């Protein structure tokens, strides 16, 4: 409170509508009469495959930690510039972790607030229907084409040499995809069975989170016609590699 009063805060910028990011914005806005800026259009930002899965009423799980009632005062668009007293911030739409995820680039400083799309301590959770591997790869490529060289993430320490770090995250996801494919080439598995093999000897919460990432990869591979699903698309059903 003392910091906000001293610095005369004028904008509340929210990276995405997860419960560990957006709820405090409502309280701060009320207590200090500061407007909230965010993407705010989660349903519209979902990828076409995720919209299709949701419209099919399939049991795909997900929605972990979603702040479903979050609404900003102002809705932001990709590449929009927000101007303050002595600063300007570019909005960078980066879906993948969550469809409404934004990064904020401080133009004068070449610094990017990267939210959860790039965290300082591990790769991010991608949990369908709001997490999407295809969108995630596109967002990483988008960041690689930018000039921001320092990231301030929502979790973890400041990221120096940001492009190198983002390239490392992309490489990790490609390696994970190859792991999944190598398992499916042996025989069909569901997402939980694959996660058990990849994250073996890890605590159960880690394996479950890993299974959501695996399921996101499976949906992406399915969309690309690399694999097929036995029955309806679900983390419980088996996926099989397609020999071409």
Language model features with spans:
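Histidine-centered divalent metal-coordination motifs
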Residues: 15-21, 97, 155, 217
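Active-site HxH/HxHxD metal-binding segment of metal-dependent hydrolases
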Residues: 2-83
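Metallo-beta-lactamase
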Residues: 53-55, 88-179
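Glycine-rich phosphate-binding loop signature in dinucleotide/nucleotide-binding domains
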Residues: 3-7, 83-87, 107, 145-146, ...
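Aromatic/hydrophobic pocket-lining residues that form the small-molecule binding cavity
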Residues: 22, 136, 140, 214
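Short hydrophobic/aromatic-enriched beta-strand-loop microsegments
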Residues: 33-39, 113-115, 206
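C-terminal regulatory/interaction regions
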Residues: 182-244
């Amino acid at each position: 409170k003392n910091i906000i009063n001293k610095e005369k805060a004028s904008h509340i910028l929210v990276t995405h509508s997860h419960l560990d990011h957006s709820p405090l914005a409502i309280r701060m806005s009320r207590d200090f009469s500061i407007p909230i800026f965010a993407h705010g259009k989660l349903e519209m930002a979902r990828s076409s495959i995720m919209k299709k899965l949701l419209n099919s009423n399939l049991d795909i799980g997900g929605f972990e930690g979603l702040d479903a009632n979050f609404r900003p005062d102002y809705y932001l668009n990709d590449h929009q510039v927000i101007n303050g007293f002595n600063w300007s911030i570019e909005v960078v739409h980066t879906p993948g972790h969550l469809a409404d995820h934004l990064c904020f680039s401080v133009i004068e400083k070449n610094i990017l607030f990267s939210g959860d799309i790039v965290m300082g301590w591990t790769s991010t959770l991608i949990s369908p229907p709001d997490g999407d591997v295809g969108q995630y790869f596109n967002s990483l490529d988008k960041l690689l084409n930018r000039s921001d060289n320092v990231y301030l993430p929502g979790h973890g320490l400041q990221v120096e040499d940001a492009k190198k770090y983002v390239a490392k995250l992309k490489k990790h996801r490609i390696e994970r995809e190859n792991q999944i494919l190598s398992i499916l080439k042996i025989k069909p598995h569901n997402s939980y069975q694959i996660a058990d093999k990849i994250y073996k000897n890890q605590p159960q919460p880690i394996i479950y989170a890993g299974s959501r990432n695996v399921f996101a990869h499976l949906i992406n591979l399915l969309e690309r016609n690399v694999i097929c699903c036995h029955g309806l698309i679900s983390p419980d059903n088996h996926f099989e590699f397609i020999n071409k």
